[in-house]
Amino acid sequence: MKYESGRSMVEMIGVLAIMGVITAGAILLINVGLNSSKRRSVDDEVTMLVTGIRDSFSGYDDFSGIGNVNVFTMTGVSQQNPYGGTYGVAVDPSNPRQFIVSINGLSQSECEALKVRTWPGSIGYEMSGHKESGATGTCTNPNGENVVQITFGE
C-alpha cells in the first residue's frame, strides 16, 4: 500500500469553498455596517440642520427668509450628504411657517429606508400621532436620482 502525503484536490476545493463563504459573509457585514453608519450620519445632519434653522428663525413669524440665508454655513452642516447627493432646504410653498429638508441623490433602497424612518418633529410625524415617518419621497427613479423630503415647522 502506497501512502501519500499532502492534501488532495477535493480537500483544497473544500477549504477554498469555506473561505469563499466566510469572505462573502464578511463583505456583507461590512456593507451593512457602512449603510447603518451613513443613515446615522444623515439623521445627525438633518437634526443639526433643523435645530440650527429653528434657533436662527425663532424670532420670526415664519421661515420665508430661509432662501436668503445660507443655512449650511449657518448650521455648520455640509451640503453634501453621505450618499454623494446633496441636502436642500426651502420654505414650504403652501405654508411659510414650515420648511422642507430634502435629501437628494439616493439609491432606491436608501430612499425607501429614509422615507419610512421616523423623523421626530416633522409635520407628518406629529400629525399622525407619532405613527408615521413624516417623510415623503419618490423612490422609483434610477439609483442616485431619488429624493426624500421632510417637512418641519408648525
Each language-model region and where it sits:
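Membrane-proximal N-terminal amphipathic helix
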Residues: L28-G65
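N-terminal single-pass transmembrane signal-anchor helix
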Residues: M1-L34
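Short, functional N-terminal and low-complexity linear motifs
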Residues: I13-G20, R39-R40, V77-Y83
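Short N-terminal micro-motifs specific to bacterial/archaeal maturation
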Residues: Y3, V21, R40, S102-G105
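Periplasmic/extracellular, small/polar-rich flexible segments of pilin-like filament-forming proteins
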Residues: D55-E154
